[in-house]
From Swiss-Prot:
Homodimer. GO terms for cellular component: cytoplasm. The last Arg residue of the ACP-binding site is essential for the weak association between ACP/AcpP and FabH. The gene is fabH. Its EC number is 2.3.1.180. PANTHER family: 3-OXOACYL-[ACYL-CARRIER-PROTEIN] SYNTHASE, BETA-KETOACYL-[ACYL-CARRIER-PROTEIN] SYNTHASE III, CHLOROPLASTIC. GO terms for biological process: fatty acid biosynthetic process. It comes from Clostridium perfringens (strain 13 / Type A). InterPro entries: ACP_syn_III_C (IPR013747), ACP_syn_III_N (IPR013751), FabH (IPR004655), Thiolase-like (IPR016039). NCBIfam families: fabH (TIGR00747), PRK09352.1 (NF006829). Pathway: Lipid metabolism; fatty acid biosynthesis. This is Beta-ketoacyl-[acyl-carrier-protein] synthase III. It is found in: Cytoplasm.
Amino acid sequence: MKNAKMIGFGLYTPKNLVENERLQEFLETSDEWIRTRTGIERRYISLDENTSDLAVEASKKALSQARLSAEEIDLIIVATVTPDNFTPSTACIVQDKLGAKNAWAFDINAACTGFIYALKLGRSLIRSGEANNALIIGAETLSKALNWEDRGSCVLFGDGAGATVLTSTEEDCGIKCVNVKSDGSKGDSLVIQGLPLNSPFKDGREVSENYINMNGREIFKFATKVMEESIVEILEKENIKIEDIAAIIPHQANLRIIDYVVKRLGIPREKFITNLQNYGNTSGASIPIALCESIDEGNLKKGDNIIMVGFGGGLTWGAALIKL
């Protein structure tokens, strides 16, 4: 049976690097306060590049590594909560900028779990024969959704993009399994407000502040629970031992969350790939950025089994087992 194999990887960040110390210039915070509570030391903040721009640059690298032209791509999925516009979709903008004229393109919004959701869709479409070469992208410019006066949230996030090319294969490799779940009843724990209902037929006009609003305590409890459960579930479902897993790539939200899960599972800390100290929380881009960086640095190789695990607004969560 056909499967979807990863054959190209690319990441991209804006040029504007913001160390923790720069945040002290306008926030009541410090490098020590941020590092001890989150593990974050720096992040990239876009000055003039939108989500599609970051996605395009990451995609160019992935296509180059895959040795495919843009015209050979027949599917583009962008996972993002910070699109350029409501419409056209960021994926359609990426399609145009790349010259991928044979691809159909759309966005999905599953917040920080978005890349895992996108992998599930890409894999399913390739297995069904609806696509042959798919470009799967996680890209965010979260800086435009931040309240830069709220030190509890604005210090956490960064901008960036990661992309991978999936292709159809008969080989015993690729995306082995993807489990995703949702719980909309707890969606108010992490919100970026949309436009309010605001018509001339309604009494009074509403004003919306489209900032990230997060209940940190609730998200911590949720994240640690579902990350642990997702890892255990996918190991049991695929009948694979943790010793056979080369690496686990978690959503890069907070070092405390990752360390808590490591302790709960009793898995060696070195199996967990973390790079949030350099990028912050890039939402749907965090897992592909960590994946691509690990590939680039030679920390992952062909034949390795890896688990990606994420959680995010919605609430959403999920995990994927992949043989590179």
